[in-house]
Amino acid sequence: MTTNRLVLSGTVCKTPVRKVSPSGIPHCQFVLEHRSTQQEAGFSRQTWCRMPIVVSGQQSQALTHSITVGSQLTVEGFISCHQGRNGLNKLVLHAEQIEFIDSGD
């Protein structure tokens, strides 16, 4: 099996952290908060999640400097499991495409 795609829209809720790996690859990490109403089994359901996002590579870094807390984005990429410093595993969305959502203001 090779399919691993996720598209999620939401609002950046934690300040982006920019780092460079020991191998020289720039990374930007932030958290995207999603809230929506979805249909399930014929009923409306309120959904909510916070998803850690990682953007890697030189070509993406110019875009990430425009991302701030409150930015509304649609992020597309693949998910992977990362082990945190506390030893717990968490899902992380590795962004391959990011679009800013026009707030209409």
UniProtKB/Swiss-Prot annotation:
Q: Which Pfam families has this protein been placed in?
A: SSB_1
**Which InterPro entries does this one have?**
NA-bd_OB-fold, Primosome_PriB/ssb, Prisomal_replication_PriB
Q: Which domain of life is it from?
A: Bacteria
The SSB domain covers 1-102
Q: Name one GO biological process term.
A: DNA replication, synthesis of primer
Q: Which GO terms describe its molecular function?
A: single-stranded DNA binding
| Keywords of the record | DNA replication, DNA-binding, Primosome
Q: What does it do?
A: Involved in the restart of stalled replication forks, which reloads the replicative helicase on sites other than the origin of replication; the PriA-PriB pathway is the major replication restart pathway. During primosome assembly it facilitates complex formation between PriA and DnaT on DNA; stabilizes PriA on DNA. Stimulates the DNA unwinding activity of PriA helicase.
Q: Could you tell me which NCBIfam families the record lists for this protein?
A: PriB_gamma
Q: Could you describe the subunit structure of this protein?
A: Homodimer. Interacts with PriA and DnaT. Component of the replication restart primosome. Primosome assembly occurs via a 'hand-off' mechanism. PriA binds to replication forks, subsequently PriB then DnaT bind; DnaT then displaces ssDNA to generate the helicase loading substrate.
Give the family from UniProt: Belongs to the PriB family.
Q: What is this protein called?
A: Replication restart protein PriB
